[in-house]
């Protein structure tokens, strides 16, 4: 039985974040609720990200790919053993979105991968794992995925 009742995991569709989903699902198992979150910035609000990130911008702007990312992550979570899985697309920067969601849901654990978007995106958005671990008020698991 899991000591955690609610687990939040962030994904941007990267291999690293999907491995974090796998680990979060294993922890949640059949007993805990697993919330898979993906943050995005609407293109009309952050056209600058699209200019800077080019081909990688779809991971943080617009809504179309978010639902596919969340669907794929939910399927992976079920395959890894999670039973109670919710998907949450969230408008906002990844760190703010994950920390706020964990607070709102009274999560016991927040899970992120140790590597996220490309180096350029990381420079633009900052290190999600480092910033989440500093700001979260709940346990944070940084899954080594490299």
From Swiss-Prot:
Organism: Mycobacterium tuberculosis (strain ATCC 25618 / H37Rv)
Superkingdom: Bacteria
Pfam families attached to this UniProt entry: Usp (PF00582)
Similarity section: Belongs to the universal stress protein A family.
One GO term of the biological process aspect: response to stress
Designated name of the protein: Universal stress protein Rv1636
GO cellular-component term (any): plasma membrane
Transmembrane segments: none
């Amino acid at each position: 039985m899991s000591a955690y009742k609610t687990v939040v995991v962030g994904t941007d569709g990267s291999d690293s974040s999907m491995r974090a989903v796998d680990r979060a699902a294993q922890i949640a198992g059949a007993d805990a609720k697993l919330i898979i979150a993906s943050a995005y910035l609407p293109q009309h609000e952050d056209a600058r990200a699209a200019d800077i990130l080019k081909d990688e911008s779809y991971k943080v702007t617009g809504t179309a790919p978010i639902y596919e990312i969340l669907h794929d992550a939910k399927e992976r979570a079920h395959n890894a053993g999670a039973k109670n899985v919710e998907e949450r697309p969230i408008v906002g920067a990844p760190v703010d979105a994950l920390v706020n969601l964990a607070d709102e849901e009274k999560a016991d654990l927040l899970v992120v991968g140790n590597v996220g978007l490309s180096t350029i995106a990381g420079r633009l958005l900052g290190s999600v794992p480092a910033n989440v671990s500093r700001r979260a008020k709940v346990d944070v698991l940084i899954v080594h995925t490299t």
